[in-house]
């Protein structure tokens, strides 16, 4: 009988990526199979996020529910990982002594040994250190789960914005070697992945070492990923304005695989608030980046992050943010009311903004961006859009769900053999959170590159001399 593993994940796409790697690692090392039923699980892992308010209490509430299961089934292993584990490791040991394993984002590769050790030790096993990029050397080969895949290319952040815990929970910026990133993506492409999303807390700060000792820039990496057979779409998240350099913008001019959609957080449109946040750019500098991007790629759409109610934010500061939103014409956003994160400088800033004012500002901001997003969606009506078919529709299992370049879900009628392929659809209706389309053409009628695996490519160019020594022509 196989052992069962349950992983509950909160937070960003990096956490989702980490959780998938935990599952692969424990399956490869110990044969654990995933389950969604806590009662079935032999190992319960909680991958946490400390960005939002009351993150710690949310963790302890979940652990309390799992303690009930452990009381009934004493052999169950409970583990806590992610950013809250890094921040609150000692506190978790004190308040929840029944937790067996505590690990950070950079030590998840040690999970098999930690779980094994916890089964013989009375005290919780804890490792929340920052061993740089070691975890990627210990993970099993990537396993595709559909036509899209996330690939982490760097970890941590060195910007130390005053409101953010990431540098304290994930460490400073460390980039994976270029060859490792390309090899992982090539492996995924061989398994049918067509779209890759490059991940990092500050992804465009990527500076990956190459085999010859040189450093690969993010712009160079984008072009190299685009050259991999089978990869027809590239996304990346999350980027920072400081590192959004002209060489990256130039990639938008000559690399069609890079989608015409960018998430570029700005947080505020007020220069005064940006200074208090320790954001190293002004609103005008941010708009300058957007102008250059739209010159390189006129149809690009932009999404962003916003924090309202930051300590000291005045009505004028907020109106500056609203002006930026309208000037840039953002398509989407992740927007939140400021919540102080323990251990960050902004947690000590005095704040006398009434809660009702914060809520009203957030509502106004979200309504404005939602209206802009709906306008963009309506402009797509009656147009043809190239979409990647991701799977069955979540609303109607007899239909298919696909995604546009600008990150909109399109539901349409089509056969299951289209899953994992690109198709062209005509947009026939627009809704708040999705579009409806009609199938126009399938991939066989498109002029896409043929997918040739490395094995097939080498077989085509293999030449042997009289001694049987093979050579290959790239």
UniProtKB/Swiss-Prot annotation:
Amino-acid positions noted as binding [4Fe-4S] cluster 1 in the UniProt annotation, renumbered to this chain: 12, 49, 83
Reaction(s) catalysed by this chain's protein: N(6)-dimethylallyladenosine(37) in tRNA + (sulfur carrier)-SH + AH2 + 2 S-adenosyl-L-methionine = 2-methylsulfanyl-N(6)-dimethylallyladenosine(37) in tRNA + (sulfur carrier)-H + 5'-deoxyadenosine + L-methionine + A + S-adenosyl-L-homocysteine + 2 H(+)
Subcellular location(s) per record: Cytoplasm
KW Isomerase (keyword) present: no
Stored Pfam families: Radical_SAM (PF04055), TRAM (PF01938), UPF0004 (PF00919)
Every TRAM domain range: 378-441
One Gene Ontology MF term: 4 iron, 4 sulfur cluster binding
Domain Radical SAM core: 143-375
UniProt: [4Fe-4S] cluster 2 binding residues: 157, 161, 164
Keywords from the UniProt entry: 4Fe-4S, Cytoplasm, Iron, Iron-sulfur, Metal-binding, S-adenosyl-L-methionine, Transferase, tRNA processing
Cofactor binding note of this UniProt entry: Binds 2 [4Fe-4S] clusters. One cluster is coordinated with 3 cysteines and an exchangeable S-adenosyl-L-methionine.
Residue intervals of the MTTase N-terminal domain: 3-120
Record Gene3D superfamilies: Methylthiotransferase, N-terminal domain, tm_1862 like domain
EC number per UniProt: 2.8.4.3
One Gene Ontology CC term in the entry: cytosol
UniProt cross-references to InterPro entries, sorted A to Z: Elp3/MiaA/NifB-like_rSAM, Methylthiotransferase, Methylthiotransferase_CS, Methylthiotransferase_N, Methylthiotransferase_N_sf, MiaB_methiolase, rSAM, rSAM_horseshoe
SUPFAM superfamilies linked to this entry: Radical SAM enzymes
UniProt cofactor(s): [4Fe-4S] cluster
PANTHER family (alphabetical): CDK5 REGULATORY SUBUNIT-ASSOCIATED PROTEIN 1, MITOCHONDRIAL TRNA METHYLTHIOTRANSFERASE CDK5RAP1
Subunit structure: Monomer.
Family matches, as HAMAP family: tRNA_metthiotr_MiaB (MF_01864)
Role of this protein: Catalyzes the methylthiolation of N6-(dimethylallyl)adenosine (i(6)A), leading to the formation of 2-methylthio-N6-(dimethylallyl)adenosine (ms(2)i(6)A) at position 37 in tRNAs that read codons beginning with uridine.
Assigned protein family: Belongs to the methylthiotransferase family. MiaB subfamily.
Name assigned to this protein: tRNA-2-methylthio-N(6)-dimethylallyladenosine synthase
Organism: Vibrio parahaemolyticus serotype O3:K6 (strain RIMD 2210633)
Lineage: Bacteria, Pseudomonadati, Pseudomonadota, Gammaproteobacteria, Vibrionales
